[in-house]
């Protein structure tokens, strides 16, 4: 009886060991599958983030360069006066050119962080840095675009209450150029909003993944 009891105990121990090993293997497989699926989802968001940053770079460079080159001289002039309009005649447009150029430079510098997010989709630090930085930069972009839009509106419509006459009837090409620059900057603002949403979604997914793991 003692031998039979010993034999039964060994059998139960072996069975429990096998079950435990199967459970550990299954848990590892589940963890690997979850990490692979989560990483693929976040890598897709990171790739979209990178492409969107490239588009924003093109948009901001276009906005800044178009505003910088906006200039028009009327074909008629007097002996002492020449009618000319340029971006440097308006402090707001100068602020626009400098600010949007800084935004374009930031976007170029942010590309390595976006690439790191593609290579390591489960890394939270690059995504957090991009989220904070994008939030700050979108404020600057919005301020520059809004200020320039106000001047463009006055250039097109004037202000009868202050006797400010519209100048776009005379400087049509100049107004068209600055209006295009403002539109491009506004598109860049939309890009930044999408980038911020992408970073927020990625961080939320990372928090849920690590908390559940």
UniProtKB/Swiss-Prot annotation:
Coiled coil: none
Topology feature Cytoplasmic, residues: 2-43, 116-134, 202-213
Extracellular membrane side: 65-94, 156-180
Subcellular location: Cell membrane
Pfam families noted in UniProt: CASP_dom
InterPro entries referenced in this protein's UniProt entry, alphabetically: CASP/CASPL, CASP_dom, CASPL
Membrane-topology annotation of the record: Multi-pass membrane protein
Transmembrane segments: 44-64, 95-115, 135-155, 181-201
Highest taxon listed in the record's lineage: Eukaryota
GO term, biological process aspect, one: cell wall organization
Annotated GO CC locations: plasma membrane
Residues recorded as bearing N-acetylalanine in the entry: 2
Main localisation: membrane
Annotated keywords: Acetylation, Cell membrane, Cell wall biogenesis/degradation, Membrane, Transmembrane, Transmembrane helix
Family membership: Belongs to the Casparian strip membrane proteins (CASP) family.
NCBIfam families: A_tha_TIGR01569
UniProt subunit comment: Homodimer and heterodimers.
Job of this protein: Regulates membrane-cell wall junctions and localized cell wall deposition. Required for establishment of the Casparian strip membrane domain (CSD) and the subsequent formation of Casparian strips, a cell wall modification of the root endodermis that determines an apoplastic barrier between the intraorganismal apoplasm and the extraorganismal apoplasm and prevents lateral diffusion.
Protein known as: Casparian strip membrane protein 1
Originating organism: Raphanus sativus
